[in-house]
């Protein structure tokens, strides 16, 4: 058996219905049920891997395990039996190289307050009675500064064990989030989108300690590429679908084809035929024409 078994990894497209508890008639069948493609999707869905988690002002603290309880229990039961027989050097360790969280604001930029994201160990939480960050893997960002990416990494592998006796809780890495300073806003003020990959190992190790990494993301500029041509096409796309083809104030509207032919916001250049007669074609532009309503006919200007 390999020293490392990968239970899952995924992204926002990782979705599946929650399945049944893993089981099998042999070691091979059990391993298949634990780490098959179907099982990977099921446990990813259980722990909301790649799913958005809503941070609400009335629920400022949130926590999720990086591996669901049912999967840890199944692995621990199998590994313990192998360990007791001397077939494995340990009951197993959880290895998580890194966790990346994408934070997005869902309120206006003037909103006060901040978000703190922490990497936790439920074993430490059980001893301390509070969710504390391990290895200083904690970062705080102001809501007004979002969007942002936060990367966290532990310096050790988490033992696969039960805390508090046989009926206790499985020890596991987890992500805790906390809202602070949010005033006067109800509902969700931000969402987090976490990505990670967890491995089960028979042999543990320690790793170089790194501080949490925070990367500010440039907000998408929806107007930067909006030149006159794209603005004209945008208006046409809206107005042509919303034109009422009935009567307006007793007068028939122009057809959609006629409206689409009008050159909004841009004065046409002189046409060869007009130049020959000393005449310039021009299109009248008004609030009505921009809104998709009929525009006046071309006018002639005599030089």
Swiss-Prot record:
Residues 1-24, 267-303 are annotated as: Disordered. One of its GO terms (cellular component) is host cell plasmodesma. Residues 1-18 have a biased composition (Polar residues). It is found in: Host cell junction, Host plasmodesma. Phosphorylated by host. GO terms for biological process: transport of virus in host, cell to cell. Its main location: host cell. InterPro entries: MPV. Keywords: Host cell junction, Transport, Viral movement protein. Pfam families: 3A. Belongs to the bromovirus movement protein family. Transports viral genome to neighboring plant cells directly through plasmosdesmata, without any budding. The movement protein allows efficient cell to cell propagation, by bypassing the host cell wall barrier. Acts by forming a tubular structure at the host plasmodesmata, enlarging it enough to allow free passage of virion capsids. This is Movement protein. It comes from Brome mosaic virus. The lineage of its organism: Viruses, Riboviria, Orthornavirae, Kitrinoviricota, Alsuviricetes.
């Amino acid at each position: 058996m390999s020293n490392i078994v990968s239970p899952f990894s995924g992204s926002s497209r990782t979705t599946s219905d929650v399945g049944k508890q893993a089981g099998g008639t042999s070691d091979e069948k059990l391993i298949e049920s634990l780490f098959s493609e179907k099982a990977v999707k099921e446990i990813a869905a259980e722990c909301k891997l790649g799913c958005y988690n809503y941070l609400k002002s009335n629920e400022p603290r949130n926590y999720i395990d990086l591996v669901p309880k049912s999967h840890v229990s199944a692995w621990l039961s199998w590994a313990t039996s192998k360990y007791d027989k001397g077939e494995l050097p340990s009951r197993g360790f959880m290895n998580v190289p890194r966790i990346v969280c994408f934070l997005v604001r869902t309120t206006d930029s003037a909103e006060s307050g901040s978000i703190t994201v922490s990497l936790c160990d439920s074993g430490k939480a059980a001893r301390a009675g509070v969710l504390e960050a391990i290895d200083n893997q904690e970062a705080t960002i102001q809501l007004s500064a979002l969007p942002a990416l936060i990367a966290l990494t532990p310096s050790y592998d988490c033992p696969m064990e039960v805390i508090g006796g046989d009926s206790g809780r499985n020890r596991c890495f987890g992500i805790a989030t906390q809202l602070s300073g949010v005033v006067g806003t109800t509902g969700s003020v931000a969402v987090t989108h976490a990505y990670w990959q967890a491995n089960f190992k028979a042999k543990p190790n320690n790793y170089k300690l790194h501080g949490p990494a925070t990367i500010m993301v440039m907000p998408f500029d929806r107007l930067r590429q909006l030149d006159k041509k794209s603005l004209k096409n945008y208006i046409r796309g809206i107005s042509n679908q919303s034109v009422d083809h009935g009567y307006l104030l007793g007068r028939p509207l122009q057809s959609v084809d006629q409206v689409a032919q009008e050159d909004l916001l841009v004065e046409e250049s002189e046409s060869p035929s007009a130049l020959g007669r000393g005449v310039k074609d021009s299109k009248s532009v008004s609030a009505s024409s921009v809104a998709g309503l009929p525009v006046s006919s071309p006018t002639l200007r005599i030089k």
